């Protein structure tokens, strides 16, 4: 299937660990025979001015812009399939395949966190995420999703727009009604899991492995987490330890 993989990040001052993620996707595309497109900050030119005035440059604007890029890829560039991968997704296994029986699919994460402050107990929640999005030509979900995102932001109070409002939170709500095809091989790591990976193991990592439907082959490293809690050396340690996730 003629496939384009789309990614976006700023063109300058790319953190070394983000570059490693981008390189892992490039290798994966070469192995799979996919074409790849990288878009810089010009991605925000695809978002209506009124939308940008409300959200600014950030994940909420990117959530809509990625849908515009995917629509353009399928409608006007001759591709049968478009796959979006966030810039902070690291592909562990270049032989990973993304497939689904329907016309679209989204990622599924097992998010491990403290069950209640002070208890020391962990819980794992399965969530839908859009760090990976797969759409095929003729998909009816794509235009519906675009219109839904615009409608939500148009009516939203600018002071109460949450980062995941039209991304994971919207998809999780729609999934309960639509039952999307999911791609659990592209997961995500929480702060607790990240700390265990750097340490070489721990209860959060063990719980993630236990609750994963299939071994993860790619991971959203959550740039906001790394930027706020880790320096570049720790980010390198995290990436070096990721193979722990497929050794169970």
Positions of predicted regions on the chain:
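A structural signal for short, well-ordered beta-strand segments and their strand-loop junctions
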Residues: 36-39, 81-86, 105-107, 182-187
């Amino acid at each position: 299937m003629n496939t384009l993989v789309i990614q976006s990040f700023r063109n300058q001052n790319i953190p070394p660990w983000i570059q490693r993620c981008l390189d892992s996707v490039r290798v994966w595309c070469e192995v799979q025979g996919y074409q790849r497109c990288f878009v810089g900050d010009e991605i925000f030119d695809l978002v209506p001015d009124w939308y940008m005035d409300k959200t600014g440059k950030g994940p909420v604007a990117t959530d809509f812009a990625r849908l515009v890029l995917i629509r353009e890829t399928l409608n006007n560039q001759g591709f049968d399939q478009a796959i979006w991968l966030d810039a902070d997704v690291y592909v562990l296994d270049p032989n990973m395949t993304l497939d689904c029986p329907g016309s679209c699919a989204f990622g599924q994460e097992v998010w491990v966190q403290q069950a209640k402050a002070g208890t020391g107990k962990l819980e794992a929640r399965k969530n839908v995420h859009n760090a990976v999005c797969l759409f095929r030509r003729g998909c009816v979900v794509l235009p519906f999703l675009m219109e839904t995102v615009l409608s939500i932001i148009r009516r939203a109070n600018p002071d109460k727009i949450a980062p995941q409002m039209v991304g994971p939170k919207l998809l999780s709500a729609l999934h309960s009604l639509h039952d999307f095809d999911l791609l659990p091989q592209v997961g995500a790591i929480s702060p607790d899991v990240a700390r265990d990976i750097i340490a070489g193991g721990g209860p959060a990592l063990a719980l993630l492995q236990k609750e994963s439907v299939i071994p993860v082959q790619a991971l959203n490293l959550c740039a906001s987490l790394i930027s706020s809690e880790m320096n570049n050396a720790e980010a390198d340690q995290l990436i070096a330890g990721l193979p722990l996730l497929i050794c169970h």
